[in-house]
Amino acid sequence: MRKLTSFVCGTGAGFAAYYLQRLRDPQAAVHNSWTNSDKPVDPWALWDTNWDCREPRALVRPLRNSQPEEENRYNAELEKAKAKKARHIILVRHGEYLDVGDSDDTHHLTDRGRKQAEFTGKRLSELGIKWDKIVASTMVRAQETSDIILKQIEFEKEKVVNCAFLREGAPIPPQPPVGHWKPEASQFLRDGSRIEAAFRRYFHRAYPDQEKESYTLIVGHGNVIRYFVCRALQFPAEGWLRISINHASITWLTISPSGNVSIKYLGDSGFMPPELLTNRIPRDVKNVV
């Protein structure tokens, strides 16, 4: 009986301490609704159906009245504004490169970086994709990666779109911040608006007249790709630096006709041998493969 009383008292004291802690620090509470409720806890968890400003209801003139003729007009225009097919956007990070000198002209791929790009090109060829569009950043390392990939897939080099908006940069101050990388606020302002403009240029649901699924290949940079992933999935964009992707890795996002976005690959590099898996700039130039 004495043991039972001791157990009950101890348990009660534990619950009391837990309850008092909850009152003092409500942010530390674990919400059961995170796991068993269909109602999101935080507003940002709600999906914005008009994220690309192409939601049919946002493009069509609203109903003016409830007359059958007006409803028929509205429904016809609504149907005409709807996308019919999905868009697939495949993002490839450039291969490993040498960060030698201040000019981008000196930032060429290493031997290992070229091998990485070759493996990526072979992988894309194996997927048997018929590319509708290929876009590459204008930075040297992305251009060289794109050129190597083009040797493996069926696409005319003259049709590649070179886009300065895709150049590497600082998209948005990351959370949590890191001590080893602290660009000036002016750089975030300059790069962030450019990278966001690139996102809006390439990420949107299909146009209504698109009759088949489309495939766009974008050869770019780690920061830009990670920011794109967060924006496309409507995750907090400040979390982009929590993601790590390897050199020449493949990230695949699909935008459905409804505007919903899903991710198929994130930084996939499993098709490369282990010795080619890298994600940082080599510091010792002499030891570069």
From Swiss-Prot:
The EC code for this enzyme is 3.1.3.16
Q: Which family does it belong to?
A: Belongs to the phosphoglycerate mutase family. BPG-dependent PGAM subfamily.
Q: Which InterPro entries match?
A: His_Pase_superF_clade-1, His_PPase_superfam, Mito_Ser/Thr_phosphatase
According to UniProt, the name of this protein is Serine/threonine-protein phosphatase Pgam5, mitochondrial
Ranked from the top, the taxonomy reads: Eukaryota, Metazoa, Ecdysozoa, Arthropoda, Hexapoda
Name the source organism. Drosophila yakuba
Sorted alphabetically, which CDD domains does this protein's record hold? HP_PGM_like
GO terms (BP aspect): positive regulation of mitochondrial fission; positive regulation of mitochondrial fusion; protein dephosphorylation; response to anesthetic; response to heat
Per the entry, what this protein does is: Displays phosphatase activity for serine/threonine residues, and dephosphorylates and activates Pk92B kinase. Has apparently no phosphoglycerate mutase activity.
Q: Which Gene3D superfamilies match?
A: Phosphoglycerate mutase-like
Top-level EC class: hydrolase
GO terms for MF:
kinase binding; phosphoprotein phosphatase activity; protein serine/threonine kinase activator activity; protein serine/threonine phosphatase activity
- Quote the subunit structure annotation: Interacts with Pk92B/ASK1.
Gene expressing this chain:
Pgam5
- What main location does UniProt list? mitochondrion
Q: Which reaction does it catalyse?
A: O-phospho-L-seryl-[protein] + H2O = L-seryl-[protein] + phosphate; O-phospho-L-threonyl-[protein] + H2O = L-threonyl-[protein] + phosphate
